[in-house]
């Protein structure tokens, strides 16, 4: 696997989890900086789901032709060993929405 970059979306194995943490293998947005991604064995991710409550901290994106929500209330650090196949990269406008929500 090459260098993981901010804004890319990967399949990530989130199990095992506890309590209300989001489960299963699902798409996740990489939110950690490229500098961190180059040197650390972990990355910061925000899971993506096609379901879920429409909260302000859950910007909408399109993934595989379907609307999906980026769960900024479920941000977590994961080891790169949890990463699966790269799905793609989000648009710059969606990335701006993510940043605005994280800073709000």
Which residues are covered by each model-predicted region?
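Conserved functional hotspots at enzyme active or ligand-binding sites that engage polyanionic ligands
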Residues: 1-104
